[in-house]
Amino acid sequence: TPEDFARHLKMGYVAAQLGTRFIATPECRASDAYKQAIVAASAGDIVHTERLTGVPVAVIRNAFIERYGTRAGPFARWMLRGHRRKHWMRAFYTLRSVRGLRGSLASESANGYWQAGMSVGGIDSIQPAAQIVRQYAAALSAEGVVAA
């Protein structure tokens, strides 16, 4: 939330990653189903999967993720453990993930993976990006945080 953002910066954090919040905007090219999934999700709906890139990635739990699983298979785990092999496995995962992500972004069905962070619990509507930026700026001002 904007308030959490301002509070963390006041505590000494130097930055925040707000990618999930900006998916739920009219400006984002993601499907309406993806945006609505973000609005409907809570932090408990976020799981980490290593099956997309070989390293844990946060996604919204849905029927596809339940069916597909979150752990790499035995061969992939063996590949990922090897100093030289892991690069090949990650390249394979990345190429496959890019293709899958394109489909998931455009799809109106939940038959894919939708990346999202734990902040989904603080997102309750689809808003224009400019409005979100104004809300975050107002929260900074209310907390007395001066941007450097």
Regions found by a protein language model. Give the residues of each.
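Conserved active-site-proximal phosphate/metal-binding subdomains
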Residues: P2-A148
